[in-house]
Amino acid sequence: MKTHLPKIDVQRRAWRVIDAKGAVLGRLAVQVSDALRGKDKPTFTPHLDAGDFVVVINASEVVLTGNKETAKTFMSYSGWKGGERYRTVAEVRAKHPERLVLHAVKGMLPKNRLGDRLLTKLKVYPGAEHPHAAQQPVVTAYAG
């Protein structure tokens, strides 16, 4: 069976808003990554960018199960000797709550140029306000 190649001029990129309030982080990230890739569309093609723009609001109120709030750590490396820095989820949530969602979604996208391009279509905001009202986004319910 041949891979279906949709015409570029036919594709319409919709804008979706997903409220992360009370949503489990991993389940939310699956829904967001599928929308970014376009896996819920009949024109899905693995090597093409066919997804929609996704705006995630209330990222600071996302939920992690178990004791991941204190046990899970994020590591960053400055490039210098002894430059490893470990932060817990609670520390990341206090300073940059949108990075929790970004990190989870990035891990579910392809590890190539297509994944980098898809990630630019994700907009995450810690509160309920977002500057994308002019794009007339459709509110998508969190299915978790």
Write out the residue ranges for each language-model feature:
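C-terminal structural segments of small proteins and small subunits
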Residues: 102, 109-131
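Ribosome large-subunit tunnel/peptidyl-transferase-proximal elements
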Residues: 1-103, 113, 131-144
